[in-house]
Amino acid sequence: NTLRNDNPRMNARVNFPTNQPKKILLTSKDCDKELNFFKDNDVQIYKNKDLAQIIKSFKDQDFCSILIEAGPKLANSFLQLGLVDEIISYTSNNELGDKAVSWFKENNAIENYGFKLESSYKIDSDIKEVFKKNG
């Protein structure tokens, strides 16, 4: 749903030459290839739901860092399996509407997964928070 709802580009938009990130999509649904995500880059699509196996395949491809842009369900799946060592969260005052889903509820807070707030920055009216895994 995140891909359809947000229509992200997921690329580096800078004024100098740079390597673009390798785009990987984890989905159980068919996707509209006209979405921004599919432009400018090859996309690997995984329909397998075994996240640990998918992460192992990334290691086999010599990935040294993975940025996960996900909705609450997938993000929490990665957290519950212990596959996350850093969380970067952006908070905005903009209303998301009635389809928005809360990331972390009271009994499912970031701290419950062993993360500690490392830094917090104000960017215009938004807040960027970086959480690191303890230990």
Regions inferred by a protein language model and the residue ranges of each:
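Enzymes that bind and transform nitrogen-containing heteroaromatic metabolites
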Residues: N1-G135
